[in-house]
A protein has these predicted regions:
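Extended active-site and interfacial segments that coordinate phosphate-rich ligands
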Residues: 12-19, 128-135, 230, 237, ...
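C-terminal catalytic domains of large/alpha subunits in multi-subunit enzymes
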Residues: 66, 75-77, 244-251, 279-285, ...
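Short acidic, glycine/serine/threonine-rich loops at helix termini
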Residues: 82-87, 126-129, 236-238, 261-267, ...
């Protein structure tokens, strides 16, 4: 018998919320360690070349004599570091070349030295004195510059030179083919409707509020690392490989992460260097990246150039789809932005070709960013779908409905649960889509153009193995823990809800801890998988705790419930001190696997509808209204779910209208300006969920919700702007220069 107070599905407040709003929450840089020294990174200023050995030696000597300096770590004195195992570097944005391993420069912002001093001020002042000479080599900084040059490994060094290659799969996932083809192309001349266009997206920066920070402390041969990471288990493995020590001698702590969006999913080189520096000076060392260093040291979303070709019959039925992506990675790591993956599954198309080409250039290593692949890829696909609808003279929503895929087009599997048509219907009704005039420039308000646009949202449902530990305290309180992370997504709250409901306990008798590699292992917090992954482990642990407790109650002759029917036991009404009596039996660890994903395709879906106002006199586009309907399985906490989608949409608005990392063409240096949306840029939100549980992926019926809010947003904005202005814009971000009416000079010249 379960407790009557079901918590799953209710808007329970964040369990860590009070600490956050009162300033009591402690992030990595807030950790106070006795005897702390401070480190500052020195980075390279050219995209390709070699630092002269003599200049490094000279700079190190000068800086080493500066006030308060304890140590200067350079390629000339850095201990030899080990190599990462292949499974951590193949298709993951982990650099295979150890930091400070030589004097070769592969990109602007490569780590060149670490200056350690007694205070942060002394470290920063000394680091500013570290100047070197370069032997500059020709740099390749765009994908097109190396497009025809194959990227092959250098057998002697194991490094990769410039060039491009065709990756097979996205992060070793067999079902996510980056090169895919099916069916035969339509007969020439059969189909009258065509779209053949190129869409581009720029470099985007994650820009979390919290800067990446690391504190490394050695206690003999034991290493403790406090780091703003969302993969503590993977970081421990990578650190063990670099430092050539057993994993059980490393503990990684990351109790709270102040935003990540992909930037803190993997071990970045400054973490290793902080540990090396701490060992060198014999005291704890703190290293906090500057905002400028975040642009070059913790990944980014790489540029994409996407060619989309759609062919359809006169009634809008798609008969051929091609989506070709050109993107970039660094010369020292594998990563491909998988922009075409959603195209493989989203709409019916008898003939399909999807390809991805990745170019190795002199740039920092890119990595996952919220909605990797889907965010830029759906921009191209969903704008192309609108262009096709315009050519067919069919409402954009109607065209999507006509080409709706009832099964997974890539693998032929049935969907575990798909209610996209219901998302379309409910979203259109809530938005008032039936009143949309077909012709662009038909709507005006207060002297500005108004447009309505929409798009489809989708993101895979994922689950990986994870573990959970249960400890029953002396007062009967039950503590669940897993080596996952609270990154602002509310995972502690949701896991507490799952644990309480499954165990049959009041929520105030349950807690959930995360952020410690000493807890049972869990994967990185990303890919919208944490709730399904860790939630399954918590569910298994809580269910086992409940089974053990009931068995103890009815089997123990000293129990007041001895001999009772187990089905009638309401654990929530049992005195907590009774649970404490069985502490040893009720403290254990358990795990869950990745679930059965072989027979059905698991995918979340949604529909975005938006209204924009465009003032063509000043080139300003304002998004005024947004309706989103999401099909993401069971909603465990509607407040947190709404916040996730609302944040995701805002994230997508920045991608559509503001965000890009500008580079100086001559030096490849980022110019330091990065525009982000604020509260003033947010529209009126109407966000709803279908709340259809999907128990195929996991026992709690959820699918991922963290990325799907972003996916499709830039396309909906671009489609709405076209409806408002008649301008079809295919390059992100859409800027005021794109929207302004040219100013006419006297005499008619523009």
């Amino acid at each position: 018998m379960r407790t009557a107070s079901e918590r799953v599905g209710r808007p329970v407040s964040r369990v860590e919320g009070f600490d956050k709003v009162t300033g009591r929450a402690r992030y990595t840089a807030d950790v106070d360690v006795p005897g702390l020294a401070h480190a500052v990174l020195v980075q390279t200023e050219i995209p390709h070349g070699r630092v002269t050995e003599e200049s490094v030696r000279r700079a190190a000597e000068q800086v080493g004599s500066a006030s308060g300096v304890l140590h200067v770590l350079t390629p000339l004195n850095c201990p030899a570091l080990g190599q990462l195992p292949h499974e951590l570097t193949f298709d993951l944005p982990l650099e295979r070349r150890p930091p400070l391993s030589d004097l070769t420069v592969q990109h602007v912002g490569q780590h060149l030295a670490v200056v350690v001093a007694d205070t942060l001020e002394n470290a920063a002042a000394a680091a500013s004195l570290f100047t070197v000479d370069y032997d500059v080599l020709p740099a390749q900084t765009t994908a097109r510059a190396v497009l025809t040059e194959p990227a092959a490994p250098d057998e002697e060094s194991g490094r990769i030179r410039h060039g491009s290659y065709l990756p097979d799969h996205f992060v070793k996932l067999d079902e996510e083919k980056l090169q895919d083809r099916r069916g035969e192309p339509p007969e020439r001349g059969r189909s009258a409707l065509r779209v053949d266009a190129r869409y581009t997206t720029p470099v985007n920066a994650h820009y979390p509020i919290e800067l990446s920070a690391t504190i490394a402390e050695w206690n003999g041969e034991q290493l403790t690392v406090h780091d703003s990471t969302r993969w503590i288990a993977g970081e421990r493995t990578a650190l063990a490989a670099y430092l050539a020590i057993p994993e059980d001698r490393i503990r990684v702590l990351s109790p709270l992460v102040g935003g990540a969006f992909g930037s803190k999913s993997f071990l970045w080189m400054h973490v290793v260097l902080c540990a090396v520096a701490a060992r060198a000076v014999g005291r704890p060392v703190k290293l906090v990246l500057t905002r400028d260093q975040m642009f070059t040291s913790t990944g980014h979303r790489p540029r994409t150039e996407q060619d989309v070709r759609l062919i359809a019959d006169e009634d809008g039925t798609i008969v051929s789809t091609e989506h070709h992506t050109l993107t970039e990675t660094s010369t020292v790591a594998h990563f491909c932005e998988p922009a075409g993956l959603s195209t493989r599954i989203l709409y019916t198309s008898p003939h399909l070709v999807v390809s991805h080409r990745t170019a190795r250039i002199n740039a920092p290593t890119p990595c996952f960013m919220r909605g990797p692949g889907e965010a830029p890829g759906l921009f191209a696909l969903e704008v192309a779908i609108d262009e096709l609808a315009e050519r067919a003279r069919i409402d954009p929503l109607e065209l999507r409905i006509r080409n709706h895929a009832n099964a997974d087009q890539a693998g032929g599997k049935p969907w575990s649960g798909k209610h996209l048509l219901q998302c379309y219907q409910e979203g259109a009704e809530r938005f008032g889509w039936k009143d949309r005039p077909a012709a662009p420039r038909s709507l005006q308000r207060a002297g500005v153009q108004v447009g309505w646009g929409m798009s489809t949202a989708t993101y895979p449902g994922r689950r990986m193995p994870a573990g959970c530990r249960v400890v029953t305290d002396a007062d009967g309180h039950v503590e669940f823990s897993s080596a996952t992370h609270e990154v602002g997504n509310g995972v502690r709250t949701v896991m507490t809800q799952v644990a309480a409901d499954t165990a049959g306990l009041p929520i105030d008798r349950v807690s959930f801890l995360s952020g410690d590699s000493a807890f049972p292992a869990a994967p990185y917090s990303g890919a919208s998988q944490t709730t399904a992954t860790v939630g399954s482990a918590v569910f298994a642990a809580a269910d086992e705790w409940r089974r053990r407790f009931i068995a103890a109650l009815v089997d123990d002759a000293d129990s007041p419930l001895f001999g009772a029917d187990p089905a009638t036991v309401d654990i929530g009404t049992v005195d907590p001190r009774v649970a404490a009596a069985y502490r040893e039996r009720l403290s254990f660890s358990t795990s869950s696997d990745s679930g059965d994903q072989s027979t059905q395709a698991v995918q979340s879906f949604g529909a975005h509808f938006c209204e924009v106002e465009v003032d063509e006199q000043i080139g300003r586009a304002s998004v005024t209204r947004w309706v989103a309907v999401m099909d993401c399985g069971r909603v465990l906490n509607p407040t947190l779910a709404r916040n996730q989608v609302m944040g995701g949409i805002t994230f997508g608005l920045g991608m559509a209208l503001l965000e890009q990392v500008p580079y100086d063409d001559a030096t490849a240096l980022p110019l330091g300006e990065y525009y982000l949306p604020t509260h003033a840029d947010r529209p009126d939100f109407d966000i709803s969920f279908l709340d259809h549980p999907d128990f195929h992926l996991d026992p709690i019926g959820v699918r991922g919700i963290g990325e799907i809010g972003t996916c499709g947003v830039p396309a909906a904005v671009a489609n709405a702007i076209h409806h408002a202005t008649g301008k079809r814009l295919r390059d992100l971000p859409i800027t005021l220069e794109d929207l302004m009416i040219p100013f006419e000079q006297p005499g008619g010249a523009a």
